Amino acid sequence: MRIVKCTGIFALLAGVTLWAQSIDNKFDTPQMRVYVATLLPNTPVTSRTGHATNRVFIYLDSGVMKLQDGTEKARTMEFRRGEVRWRAASGAYVEECIGDRPMRILEIELKGKPAGPLPVSKLDPTVVDAKHYKVEFENDQVRVLRVHYEAHDKGELHEHILNRVVLYLNDQPGAKADDVRIIGAATHTEQNTGDQPAERIAVEIK
């Protein structure tokens, strides 16, 4: 597995050093902006104004990062490919990574506030198909699901009631590793027709 140590900024913001990264925009909807930030190594970045919205980060590469925000002591964070983290809105910060390769992060920038209490489906995938769908974490804005199908495995009939961002972590039937899609509500049964396990992450937007 490729390990990199990087510093970078994760969004196009006023008051932020921008040459440390490139942005590959994927989607921009009323609910969210989705993009991949590719961070250059050995380039400390200062965000003077911070970030006004909450975000979900999915790390496409493994690495170690140093973060200094506010008056707190700098802390070191390690992450792995496919790890998902919540990044709350924040004030000014400085991030630093050290390594010899760029690092990529899929970022989901949440534009609105939570919609309030949501209906509960009797066919929720984490209930009727818990073998394949696990809750990574949940809060009032998102629910993050980790999806795993073994080769030739077939799931149960289930329902998705929310829009979701899906990241494919490996090559699988109908998708390549690192493909990103927005998928709407659906009731269906899924099957991995391939000869290898299928891994993906689904971020449901409330």
Predicted regions and their residues:
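Positively charged n-region of N-terminal signal peptides that target proteins for export
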Residues: 1-5
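Bacterial N-terminal signal peptides
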Residues: 6-17
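Boundary at the C-terminal end of the N-terminal hydrophobic targeting segment
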Residues: 18-22
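N-terminal targeting signals for Sec/Tat export/insertion, comprising classic cleavable signal peptides
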Residues: 27-57, 66
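Short acidic-glycine-tyrosine-enriched beta hairpin
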Residues: 28-31, 71-89, 173-187
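Glycine- and acidic-residue-biased ligand/ion/polar-headgroup-sensing regions
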Residues: 52-70, 159-174
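Ligand-binding loop in jelly-roll beta-barrel domains
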Residues: 62, 89-111, 162-163, 184-206
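Surface-exposed beta-loop interaction hotspot
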Residues: 96-141
